[in-house]
């Protein structure tokens, strides 16, 4: 492939049309790259459920001018916190305290809404659906990377591998790596109409199980659950019935949320995480991002957030397409330590949340109550160094500056 010139913009191929891949596509497009996104699915249908965007991801989106459209969808106002299955509060946390500490509130929205926002910033025809892709050449400083599709081969100055937890590109780059490990628990997610009675957003920790109920911007409710289970398990009847068995006697509004779900609308996925770091997040002209690079447990709500950060940092280091091979090591240097630190922190949080013995659970709950009495800031400290992250390069397209200094 010819080197990028004033007559030919650099070319990027993004493998995967999820949140991380689309964010990378927007960031590269705004840096004058010619971008093609290859998505295996036949359509970017409204699959998935809710996603929580913390202030760190919102600031990343500010770089591409999309932070404020996301903030406008904030539905969480007032208090929330952590409860036990009987409904007793273990700690209370307010949206105002979160915004004050980290420069913005947590924004819960449907993944399909975020995908629409990102797609609106891309030229028509950028995303090709029904387009499975195979990396056939990683490229180097003398030749292009090559991605092969059923319609032919595409040369690229940069390949962005955003192909998820089972990443085929990752296996090509690092065939000896063991990949993600089963975390010991499974998750369910569902979006339902709001219950008749108002509720306070919450996460509830039981014995080897948890439940969360959060409002969405469109008036619906996003609920998620997790429980210890063998890998690959499925309900003998349907997953809504399984949720009723496991959570039907928990505090309101949990039973009502489960009852309102359509059986076909309950999504179940086993949780895996990248226990062993990759040697790098790049090779040749190829860069990994999101779950393809650093799959993590959902216990900190940072999986999608870190993919968005990856995308912005990658575009920053890719620059205008000159010397991509020489620039990608800086992407690994910046992202690998941070993301693997969050992987480890999420794993520790998962261990705490999934305690199952009566005595350890009682001790855990007593400790959380004791710590929460010292004030909401104590609990929020667990997100210091995560939610207060600042993007590289130029700052915000939005007007609001964060109220805390970078850590």
Show where each model-derived region lies:
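C-terminal helical "tail/cap" subdomain of flavin- and related membrane-associated enzymes
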Residues: 2-10, 87, 256, 300-301, ...
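Short helix-loop capping/hinge motifs at secondary-structure junctions, enriched
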Residues: 68, 194-199, 231-233, 253, ...
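Short phosphate-binding/catalytic loops that engage adenosine nucleotides
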Residues: 33, 66, 252
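Flavin-dependent oxidoreductases
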Residues: 184-214
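Conserved mid-domain beta->alpha element of the FAD-binding
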Residues: 12-42, 160-161, 188, 265-357, ...
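Short beta-strand micro-motifs enriched in acidic
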Residues: 136-139, 214-218
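Conserved N-terminal helical subregion
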Residues: 2-12, 29, 54-174, 178-191, ...
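FAD/FMN-dependent oxidoreductases across multiple families
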Residues: 196, 207, 217, 227-300, ...
């Amino acid at each position: 492939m010819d080197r990028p010139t004033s007559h030919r913009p650099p070319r990027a191929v993004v493998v995967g049309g999820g949140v991380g891949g689309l964010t990378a596509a927007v960031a590269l497009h705004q840096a004058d790259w010619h971008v093609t996104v290859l998505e295996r699915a036949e359509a970017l249908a409204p699959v998935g459920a809710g996603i929580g965007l913390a202030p760190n991801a919102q600031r990343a989106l500010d770089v591409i001018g999309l932070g404020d459209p996301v903030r406008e969808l904030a539905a969480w106002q007032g208090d929330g916190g952590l409860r036990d299955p009987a409904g007793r509060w273990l700690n209370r946390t307010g949206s105002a305290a979160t915004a004050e500490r980290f420069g913005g509130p947590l924004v819960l929205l449907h993944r399909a809404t975020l995908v629409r926002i990102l797609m609106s910033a891309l030229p028509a025809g950028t995303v090709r659906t029904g387009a499975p892709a195979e990396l056939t050449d990683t490229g180097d400083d003398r030749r292009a990377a090559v991605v092969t599709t059923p319609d032919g081969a595409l040369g690229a100055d940069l390949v962005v591998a955003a192909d998820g937890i089972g990443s085929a590109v990752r296996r090509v780059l690092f065939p000896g790596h063991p990949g993600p490990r089963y975390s010991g628990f499974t998750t369910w997610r569902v979006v339902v109409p709001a219950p008749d009675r108002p509720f306070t957003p919450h996460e509830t920790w039981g014995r080897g199980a948890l439940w969360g109920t959060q409002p969405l911007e469109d008036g619906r409710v996003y609920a998620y659950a997790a429980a210890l289970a063998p890998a690959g398990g499925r309900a003998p009847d349907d997953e809504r019935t399984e949720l009723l068995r496991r959570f039907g006697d928990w505090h309101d509004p949990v039973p009502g949320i489960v009852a309102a779900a359509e059986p076909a609308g309950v999504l179940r996925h086993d949780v895996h995480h990248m226990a062993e770091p990759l040697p790098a997040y790049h090779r040749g002209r190829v860069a990994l991002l999101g779950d393809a690079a650093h799959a993590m447990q959902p216990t900190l709500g940072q999986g999608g957030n870190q993919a968005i950060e990856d995308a912005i940092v990658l575009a920053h280091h890719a620059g205008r397409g000159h010397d991509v091979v020489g620039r990608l090591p800086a992407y690994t240097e910046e992202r690998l330590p941070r993301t693997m630190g969050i992987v480890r922190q999420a794993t520790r949080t998962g261990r705490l949340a999934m305690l199952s013995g009566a005595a350890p659970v009682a001790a855990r709950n007593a400790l959380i109550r004791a710590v929460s009495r010292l004030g909401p800031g104590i609990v929020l400290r667990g997100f210091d160094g995560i939610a207060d992250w600042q993007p590289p390069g130029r700052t915000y397209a939005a007007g609001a500056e964060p109220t805390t200094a970078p850590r």
